[in-house]
UniProtKB/Swiss-Prot annotation:
Name recorded for this polypeptide: 7-cyano-7-deazaguanine synthase 1
Origin species: Colwellia psychrerythraea (strain 34H / ATCC BAA-681)
UniProt entry keywords in alphabetical sequence: ATP-binding, Ligase, Metal-binding, Nucleotide-binding, Queuosine biosynthesis, Zinc
Gene: queC1
Recorded catalytic activity of this chain's protein: 7-carboxy-7-deazaguanine + NH4(+) + ATP = 7-cyano-7-deazaguanine + ADP + phosphate + H2O + H(+)
Binding of Zn(2+), residues: 185, 193, 196, 199
């Protein structure tokens, strides 16, 4: 019997690769997506399409009510999405307070309920400079907590924690993945803007892999 794992699946290219890596490794995947009031809700549409295509158990949980507690992020509030590379100081406005701790806590609870021993999520080195909850020390401390928070121990596993988006895409290309149903742009428009830090990092990853990004841009 295949080992069960929960994959936090946003619908973006990183978590899409993580999802497929888990399947490639023979895991029985329980995909978990969250609507936390993000303006780039199109990523959830992509997640739904992919999970149907892969016949993966998929839950989308509406936790948008927590927006009342998470003010100050351009991803959820009426604040302009900054343009430019992730290293820019302005990109800190895209931090959603305590987001990954909240999502991981819910994913761990789900893992316990379905008998999964691991929760996969797509943190990578390109996020370390801006997002504290994507750094190795955060994953380490969360794992310490997850060992004692329940009777059942659950491991948080970030397969790409030490590599960047370019390396993630390279692994996806090796797996033969099609990224046309992934969404990265932080703006909630019909086409990707190509200007926000998230878009720029994605475009750089495709360029560095000598590959063409299949999604439409403005």
């Amino acid at each position: 019997m295949a080992e069960k794992v929960v994959v936090i699946y946003s619908g973006g290219m990183d978590s899409f690769t993580v999802l497929n890596r888990a399947k490639k490794d023979g895991k029985e995947v329980f995909a978990l997506s969250f609507d936390y009031g993000q303006r780039h809700v199109k990523e959830l549409e992509c997640a739904s399409i992919v999970c149907k295509e892969l016949a993966v158990n998929h839950k989308v949980i509406d936790i948008s009510a927590i927006n009342q507690l998470l003010a100050g992020s351009s991803l959820t509030d009426d604040i302009d999405i900054p343009e430019g590379h992730y290293e820019a100081e302005s990109m800190k406005s895209t931090v959603v307070p305590n987001r990954n701790m909240i999502l991981l806590s819910l994913a761990v609870a789900y893992a316990v309920s379905v008998g999964a021993e691991q929760v996969y999520y797509g943190a990578h080195s390109g996020d370390h400079a801006i997002y504290p909850d994507c750094r190795p020390e955060f994953v380490e401390k969360m794992n310490d907590v997850c060992k004692i928070a329940n009777y059942e121990s659950v491991e948080i596993f970030s397969p790409y924690l030490s590599v960047d988006k370019t390396a993630i895409l390279a692994d996806g290309i090796k797996m033969g993945l099609d990224y046309s149903n992934t969404w990265t742009c932080y703006n909630g428009r019909e086409k990707a803007c190509g200007k926000c830090g998230s878009c720029q990092e994605r475009l750089e990853a495709f360029e560095e892999n000598n590959a063409t990004d299949p999604i439409p841009y403005e």
